[in-house]
C-alpha cells in the first residue's frame, strides 16, 4: 500500500482500483476498531460538519483550514450521499486516516448506513463508477467501525446528530455496541438523528428517528458531564455555523457549501487552538460545485 501515491491519485480525481480500495478498507478497520465510542482528541483541532459527497468543496475545506497532518481534524459524519463524489470524499478521508491516524478522527453520521446509501446516491455512484456493488460493500463495512463521538480536551463533545433521552452521562455512550447497522431507535440511533429545538426538554422528531431536544436538556447534559459545548452537524445552516440556546451550550457546524449544488449556503469549520479558544473559518463553494447544477436542480421561473 503506497498511501502517499494513492492520496495523490485520488486528489487528481482518479479512483483506486477495486482491490486497492478493499485493501484500504481492511487496513482502516484495524485502526478504527481500537477507538473508543467517545474518542479522546487533544487540541489544537478543527471540527467539520457534513460533506455529503462534495469532493471539490472538501479540497477547499483543506485549503481553508490547513492540510493534514499540519492541521488535526474531526469530521462529524455524513461524508456520503446527495453530492456526486461520495466515493472520492470517503476514499480520501480513509486514506488520510490510514496515513495519519492520530491527526484525523472520523465520526459516524446517519448517512453512514447501508439503508440510507441505497436511497440517497452512494450505492448508485459505486455501481456506476466500478460496475458492481463491491466498492459500496467494502465502504459500508467500514461504516460499522466508525466511532460515535469525540471529546476534545475533556470539555467539548462532538457528535453527528445530538442527545438522547437514554443518555445522561458520557459513560453511557462508551458502552454502546457500535459495530452494526444504525438501529431504528434507541441511544445509538438518537446520537445520529436528533436535533436541537427551541423547547425545554424533549419532543418527537419530524425526521421519524431521533428526538428534538431543548435548552434545559442540553445545559443539564453539559453540567453533569463537565462540558463547555456540544458540537454537532446534521442540519443545514445557511450561515455555516449556528449556536443554540441562551447559554450557547451547543453549536451546529455545516461544511458543505451551496449544499446539493443549489442551497446557496456558506460553509464553515470550527477551530480550537491549544488554549481551546475558538475560531470560525467560513468558505464558499468551488467553481466545480457551480458547474454541477443539473437541470433537475433549477428552480422553475414561475415559482
From Swiss-Prot:
Subcellular locations according to the entry: Cytoplasm
SMART domains xrefs: PP2Ac
Cofactor: Zn(2+)
Annotated EC: 3.1.3.16
PROSITE patterns: SER_THR_PHOSPHATASE
Reaction equations catalysed: O-phospho-L-seryl-[protein] + H2O = L-seryl-[protein] + phosphate; O-phospho-L-threonyl-[protein] + H2O = L-threonyl-[protein] + phosphate
Signal sequence annotation: none
UniProt GO cellular component terms: cytoplasm
Tissues in which the UniProt entry reports expression: Mostly expressed in flowers and stems.
Keyword Nucleotide-binding: no
Single Gene Ontology MF annotation: protein serine/threonine phosphatase activity
One annotated GO biological process: negative regulation of flower development
UniProt-recorded name of the protein: Phytochrome-associated serine/threonine-protein phosphatase
Source species: Pisum sativum
Family per record: Belongs to the PPP phosphatase family. PP-6 (PP-V) subfamily.
Primary residence: cytoplasm
Presence of keyword Phosphoprotein: no
Quaternary structure and partners: Interacts with PHYA and PHYB, mostly when they are phosphorylated and in Pfr forms.
Coiled-coil intervals: none
Superkingdom, taxonomy of origin: Eukaryota
Cofactor note: Binds 2 zinc ions per subunit.
List of catalytic residues: 111 (proton donor)
Binding-site positions, Zn(2+) 1: 50, 52, 78
Amino acid at each position: 500500500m503506497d498511501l502517499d501515491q494513492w492520496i495523490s491519485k485520488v486528489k487528481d480525481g482518479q479512483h483506486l482500483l477495486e482491490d486497492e480500495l478493499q485493501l484500504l478498507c481492511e487496513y482502516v478497520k484495524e485502526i478504527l476498531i481500537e477507538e473508543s465510542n467517545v474518542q479522546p482528541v487533544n487540541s489544537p483541532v478543527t471540527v467539520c460538519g457534513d460533506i455529503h459527497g462534495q469532493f471539490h468543496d472538501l479540497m477547499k475545506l483543506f485549503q481553508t483550514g490547513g492540510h493534514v497532518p499540519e492541521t488535526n481534524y474531526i469530521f462529524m459524519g455524513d461524508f456520503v450521499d446527495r453530492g456526486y463524489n461520495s466515493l472520492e470524499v470517503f476514499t480520501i478521508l480513509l486514506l488520510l486516516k490510514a496515513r495519519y491516524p492520530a491527526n484525523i478522527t472520523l465520526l459516524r453520521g446517519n448517512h453512514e448506513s447501508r439503508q440510507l446509501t441505497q436511497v440517497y446516491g452512494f450505492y448508485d455512484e459505486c455501481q456506476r463508477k466500478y460496475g458492481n456493488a463491491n466498492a459500496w460493500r467494502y465502504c459500508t463495512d467500514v461504516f460499522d467501525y466508525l466511532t460515535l463521538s469525540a471529546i476534545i480536551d475533556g470539555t467539548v463533545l462532538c457528535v453527528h446528530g445530538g442527545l438522547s433521552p437514554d443518555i445522561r452521562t458520557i459513560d453511557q455512550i462508551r458502552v454502546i455496541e457500535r459495530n452494526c447497522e444504525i438501529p431504528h431507535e434507541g441511544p445509538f440511533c438518537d446520537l445520529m438523528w436528533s436535533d436541537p429545538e427551541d423547547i425545554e426538554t424533549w419532543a418527537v422528531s419530524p425526521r421519524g428517528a431521533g428526538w428534538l431536544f431543548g435548552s434545559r436538556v442540553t445545559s443539564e447534559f453539559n453540567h453533569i458531564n463537565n462540558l463547555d459545548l456540544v458540537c454537532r452537524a446534521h442540519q443545514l445552516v445557511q450561515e455555516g455555523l449556528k449556536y443554540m440556546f441562551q447559554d450557547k451550550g451547543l453549536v451546529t457546524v455545516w461544511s458543505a457549501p451551496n449544499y446539493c449544488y443549489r442551497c446557496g449556503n456558506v460553509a464553515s469549520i470550527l477551530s480550537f487552538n491549544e488554549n481551546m479558544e475558538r475560531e470560525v473559518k467560513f468558505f464558499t463553494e468551488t467553481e466545480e460545485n457551480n458547474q454541477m447544477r443539473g437541470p433537475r436542480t433549477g428552480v422553475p421561473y414561475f415559482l
